[in-house]
């Protein structure tokens, strides 16, 4: 299980009341809040609970790795999200203004007329500020990555030879980092 230093709880605490939720749609924010990388999925955060709705390609792995959200197999996004919004009595949903297109926002507004979708609430900025302050877990990952990079680069310096292309050297470095 991945521990993300309570990032979901921090976001939930920023919500104004029990009828307010945050909808996380960007890959980067999903990874930040769940510690899980995927090319699809959404996170719904309420004061009471949080949910990761994710498709079949990632579902089993997400169930194993994600601890801060209830992981739900994404089958019918419109219906599933509607049921969660109704279940929690949500009337306002903050969205990431820098991650959602106008077209996507309009679709959400059309599909969920009982909810106000707010792109001007500063959710993207709030997430950005949260990401600036590193948790102990994040610092540990940074230190580990730095050590891997240093070991790989030291090895690369021993193996690099005149006449090798940049692509070859880059491939070697990438290979060495993967080894460590």
Please provide the spans of the model-predicted regions.
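Flexible, acidic/His-enriched mid-domain "rim/lid" segments that flank
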Residues: 3, 79-180
């Amino acid at each position: 299980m991945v521990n993300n230093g309570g990032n979901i709880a921090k976001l939930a605490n920023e919500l104004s009341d029990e009828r307010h939720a945050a909808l996380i749609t960007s890959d980067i924010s999903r990874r930040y809040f769940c510690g899980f990388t995927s090319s699809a999925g959404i996170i719904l955060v309420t004061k009471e609970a949080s949910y990761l709705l994710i498709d079949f390609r990632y579902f089993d792995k997400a169930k194993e790795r994600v601890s801060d959200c209830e992981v739900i197999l994404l089958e019918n996004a419109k219906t599933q999200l509607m049921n969660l919004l109704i279940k929690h009595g949500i009337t306002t949903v903050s969205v990431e203004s820098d991650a959602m297109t106008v077209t996507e926002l309009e679709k959400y507004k059309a599909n969920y007329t009982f909810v106000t979708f707010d792109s001007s609430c500063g959710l993207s900025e709030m997430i950005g500020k949260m990401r600036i302050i590193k948790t102990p877990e994040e610092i540990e990952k940074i230190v580990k990555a730095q050590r891997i990079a240093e070991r790989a680069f030291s090895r690369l310096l021993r193996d690099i030879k005149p006449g090798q292309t940049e692509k070859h050297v880059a491939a070697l470095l990438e290979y060495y980092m993967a080894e460590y």
